[in-house]
Amino acid sequence: MGLLDAGITQHNVLITSVDNVLNWARLSSLWPMGFGLACCAIEMMATNASNYDLERFGIFPRSSPRQSDLMIVAGTVTMKMAERVIRLYEQMPEPRYVLSMGSCSNCGGPYWEHGYHVLKGVDRVIPVDVFVPGCPPRPESLIGGLMKVQELIRMEQIGLSRADALKKLAEKSVDPQFVIERERKAAGA
């Protein structure tokens, strides 16, 4: 028996904070954009299928970064692809979150030692909120990572002062040319 089933009388009052209402709305309508680069993308597609039914969690995949609040990076990120990852990340509206899926996007995977062209983790170019380990991770692991993102959203504070909000935005900003040059120098290319 829920609130709407019981009927609303004239003298009922519902008390909560604005943070709780807004966070509940955001975590109940999470719109991820998948950035599938390798075999992890197959597992991401399997997770989006009817067997796992992500829509029961309020998760509805989008294909445009301007409509997404979560980027799922799934697979090997090369130096050339890093620029596109940064560009898509910058096109997403705030608040935005990143989930790194699989060992290739987490740390370079099996290519990290001898692959001069492979980024040694997507967290070197954009801030990552949740890492999902595995090669490739099972759909259950991805769902667990998505639920971790929802927990992060649940605990967020919306009513920050302007100075705190600007500081938070500055921490998440990315200079693509600096990052690409730094990675190329580290790889010796």
From Swiss-Prot:
PROSITE patterns: COMPLEX1_20K
Gene Ontology MF term list: 4 iron, 4 sulfur cluster binding; iron ion binding; NADH dehydrogenase (ubiquinone) activity; NADH:ubiquinone reductase (non-electrogenic) activity; quinone binding
Cofactor note: Binds 1 [4Fe-4S] cluster.
GO BP of this protein: aerobic respiration; electron transport coupled proton transport
Cleaved signal peptide residues: none
Domain of life: Bacteria
Protein name: NADH-quinone oxidoreductase subunit B
Lineage: Bacteria, Pseudomonadati, Chlorobiota, Chlorobiia, Chlorobiales
